[in-house]
Every structure is written in structure tokens, then in C-alpha cells.
């Protein structure tokens, strides 16, 4: 849920008149170790393989926003400040990135698996002990529409235990209208034709079940699900396997997320067979308190 939330933040700040930059590690991208500017706000300078899938998607979907990658985010951040003069910088996936000072820490909690088993890697999925939630300035619960009210209350109780009286923003991932891959690649977002009735899904995401649930929430019926590891860079063999699986299943289309779609652009596809399901993050509860608190803290820091 990080990428949709970063998109949400960048658009809101941009609308408020800020010149926004995003710093990301660029995990598994060719520029991860060296550092690079993916977009200067006016032009996209790298492809998905060079930038990494998530930073490239951010650059593609956020015109006017600066996007840069590099393991050493302090160094690439200094370069961005010197060359491009942003007024606000969003550090994507940076709660543990100690070398870079920040004014506001936001922790995202996936409602479908909020606290794993309470254990850190490798015995669990947490990167830090739950007690470190006390460092957060605000909490954001994503995919809250995919759990029950009782589960939401339990999440709120756990967060309040670690740090009460900080903003708690509840959000949902809402699917938009699916579009043919060729249209999506050209920047079109409205599918005019009737959609096929039989799909299979394909994804290389950290939480594939969540994407598959979102496909179902969009009213689409998937007859099979193909999963690859998170951040996997697709090959032509992957495409052949997916298209062959779909045809054997009697499906008329393969549906992917936008994060997957950016990695398909260098491959040969039966383009009429492929569809993209865009999603957007929508705030449902706590939005005003969240922004007012952050703006107050930010002004104090300035």
C-alpha cells in the first residue's frame, strides 16, 4: 500500500502549491547503488528496469513531481535539493532510514495483516518490534474496507496502546475502471469496450492476495491466479507462460496491476489480451485531523 499512499500525498501537496520530490531506494533497479534522478518533474529520464518498478510508476503517474532513487538517500536527496529545489521531500519507505533527518514520520498498517505475528524478521514479517510504533507522528491504515468493523477496532486499540492522541487516518484502495494495456501505456484511463468475462490475474507483488481481492471487488471474475515474487522483473518466458495459461483456462484476458504493467513495456505481448487495473487510495476517516497535525508540525520544523 505504500505506492498508492505516496501518490495520494504527492497529489495533495502538489495541489497545495508545493514542489514535491520523492526519494526511494529503487529496490532491484539498476540505479539502486549509484543513485539517479528518475524524473525531474518535466521529463521521465529512466525506464522501469533502471529505476525500479515502484519509482518508475510514481514518475509515470505523478507529472510535475520529482522522483529520485538511490540506496544512499541522503546523498541523492542533497543532489535533488541542489539541482531541482523542491519545497517538500517525501521519503518512500523511510521509517528505518536513520541517516536522513525528517520532520514527520508516518507509519502505514495494512489492515489485512496489520501486525504479522508480532515478531520481526526472520521469525515474522515485521522489520522492527511493535514498540517502535511509538516513534510515529501519525498512523495510516490501508485497505480498511477489506476487514470487518471488529478488526478495525482491534487495530485502533493496538495503535492507541503504543501512542495515543496521534492522528489515525483510515484509507481504502479503490479499483478504477480496467483498461486495455495498450490504452494504459498511452496514458488513457477509460475503457470504452465491453470487458471480457473470463480473466486470469498475474502479479509480482508483496501481497498478491490483496490485489486479487481488489480485482474481485471491481466485479471481475478471475478463473486463475498467477503469482511471482515481489519486484520480479518479467521476462518473455513469463509472458508466454501467462498467455498460455490463460488460453488453456478459456480466459479472454490477463489483468495486472499498474506496478506490474510498467515492467511489461519492453516485452512482446498479445496486447489486446492484457488489461491493467488502476487503483487509487481514498481517505475515509480522519483526513482533516491528519493534515492539520502534519501541517502544524511541519510549520514548527520550518
Task: Annotate the PLM regions.
Residues 5:
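Hydrophobic positions on the alpha1 helix immediately C-terminal to the Walker A/P-loop
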Residues 114-253, 300-302:
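C-terminal accessory "lid"/substrate-recognition subdomains
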Residues 25-27, 93-95, 208, 258-262:
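Short, polar loop motifs at secondary-structure junctions
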Residues 26-163, 170:
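Phosphate/Mg2+-binding loops and adjacent switch elements
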Residues 18, 85-86, 249-252:
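Short, high-confidence coil segments that cap the C-terminus of an alpha-helix
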Residues 2:
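Conserved lysine of the Walker
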Residues 11-22:
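Post-Walker A helix-loop "phosphate-sensing" segment adjacent to the P-loop in P-loop NTPases
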Residues 174-178, 228-232, 271-302:
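Short, flexible loop segments at boundaries between secondary-structure elements
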Amino acid at each position: 500500500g505504500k505506492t498508492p499512499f505516496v501518490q495520494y500525498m504527492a497529489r495533495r501537496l502538489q495541489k497545495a502549491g508545493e514542489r514535491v520530490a520523492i526519494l526511494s531506494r529503487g529496490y532491484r533497479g539498476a540505479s539502486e547503488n549509484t543513485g539517479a534522478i528518475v524524473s525531474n518533474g518535466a521529463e521521465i529520464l529512466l525506464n522501469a528496469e533502471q529505476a525500479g518498478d515502484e519509482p518508475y510508476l510514481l514518475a509515470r503517474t505523478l507529472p510535475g513531481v520529482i522522483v529520485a532513487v538511490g540506496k544512499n538517500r541522503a546523498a541523492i536527496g542533497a543532489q535533488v535539493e541542489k539541482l531541482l529545489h523542491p519545497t517538500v521531500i517525501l521519503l518512500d519507505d523511510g521509517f528505518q532510514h536513520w541517516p536522513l533527518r525528517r520532520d514527520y514520520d508516518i507509519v502505514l498498517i495494512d489492515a489485512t495483516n496489520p501486525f504479522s505475528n508480532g515478531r520481526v524478521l526472520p521469525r515474522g514479517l515485521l522489520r522492527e518490534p511493535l514498540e517502535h510504533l511509538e516513534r510515529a507522528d501519525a498512523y495510516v491504515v490501508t485497505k480498511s474496507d477489506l476487514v470487518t468493523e471488529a478488526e478495525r477496532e482491534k487495530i485502533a486499540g493496538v495503535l492507541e496502546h503504543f501512542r495515543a492522541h496521534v492522528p489515525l487516518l483510515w484509507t481504502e484502495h479503490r479499483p478504477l475502471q480496467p483498461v486495455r494495456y495498450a490504452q494504459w501505456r498511452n496514458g488513457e484511463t477509460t475503457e470504452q469496450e465491453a470487458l471480457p468475462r473470463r480473466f486470469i490475474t498475474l502479479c509480482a507483488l508483496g501481497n498478491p492476495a490483496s490485489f486479487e481481492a481488489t480485482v474481485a471487488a471491481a466485479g471481475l471474475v478471475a478463473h486463475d491466479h498467477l503469482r511471482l515474487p515481489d519486484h520480479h522483473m518479467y521476462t518473455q518466458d513469463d509472458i508466454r507462460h501467462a498467455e498460455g495459461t490463460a488460453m488453456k483456462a478459456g480466459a479472454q484476458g490477463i489483468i495486472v496491476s499498474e506496478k506490474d504493467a510498467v515492467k511489461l513495456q519492453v516485452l512482446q505481448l498479445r496486447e489486446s489480451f492484457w488489461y491493467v487495473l488502476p487503483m487509487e487510495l481514498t481517505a475515509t476517516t480522519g483526513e482533516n485531523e491528519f493534515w492539520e497535525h502534519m501541517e502544524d508540525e511541519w510549520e514548527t520544523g520550518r
